[in-house]
A protein has these predicted regions:
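Short secondary-structure junctions and interdomain/linker hinges
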Residues: 12-19, 34, 70-73, 103, ...
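Short acidic alpha-helix initiation/capping motifs at coil-to-helix transition points
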Residues: 18, 54-56
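Short, hydrophobic/amphipathic alpha-helical patches that form generic packing surfaces
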Residues: 26-32, 57-69, 122-129
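Class I S-adenosyl-L-methionine-dependent methyltransferase module
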Residues: 49-54, 65-66, 70-96, 114, ...
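Residue-level recognition of alpha-helix termini/interfacial anchor residues
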Residues: 96-104
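Active-site neighborhood for divalent-cation/phosphate handling
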Residues: 108
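Conserved SAM-binding loop and adjacent beta-strand
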Residues: 111-120
Length: 177
């Protein structure tokens, strides 16, 4: 299981999600196989890999949900860069995992909802072609669990060269590197 968490942490690092990468690396050493949550994780009925059920992101999402719902406010330093040392982070995570065992078990039963606006860059670029060459608009339909924000691609501004999309977009500016 540890390799799945490490691999997902590597993916997060590669995409600039350093806080999530650090969280996942700490979780590698926090999940106790004897707890109810640990039993659920280590006996996952599907494929826990990042490319499949992505159990690491499910657990990371569950922890973030606990913070956002104010059920585990003590997690806040984890989401502020440099606010907590690794050893303290691990101790904090172990306490939160134990205290919110049942809630986290329920949370990981569902796939993570990532909705990364960065992924809209490809859709924005693709939508430009039919409009530019045929005067047609691209119509997007729900693509799956993570399609929500991507369906609003026409509200984003793509900052690539001269850019594409409304420049005064309050939604997002998608930077392409």
């Amino acid at each position: 299981m540890k390799r799945h968490f490490e691999r997902q942490a590597d993916y997060c690092s590669a995409f600039g999600a350093d806080l999530t990468a650090r969280l996942l690396r700490q979780l590698c050493n926090c999940t106790c196989a004897s707890s109810a949550l640990g039993q659920r994780i280590f006996n996952w009925p599907g494929d826990p890999a990042p490319e499949a059920d992505n159990l690491p992101l499910r657990l990371a999402g569950g922890l973030h949900a606990l913070l956002l719902s104010k059920k585990a406010r003590e997690l806040a330093p984890i989401y502020r860069k440099g606010a907590i040392a690794d050893a303290n982070m691990q101790t904090l995570l172990q306490a939160v995992l134990q205290r919110h065992d049942a809630e986290l078990i329920a949370f990981i039963e569902n796939a993570p909802q990532t909705n990364e606006v960065r992924r809209a860059a490809e859709i924005i670029a693709a939508a430009h072609w039919p409009k530019a060459y045929n005067g047609c608009d691209l119509i997007a339909s729900e693509l799956g669990a993570s399609a929500g924000l991507n369906l609003l691609f026409d509200k984003f501004h793509l900052a690539l060269g001269d850019g594409y999309g409304p420049q005064n977009s309050p939604a997002a500016k998608v930077q392409c590197y």
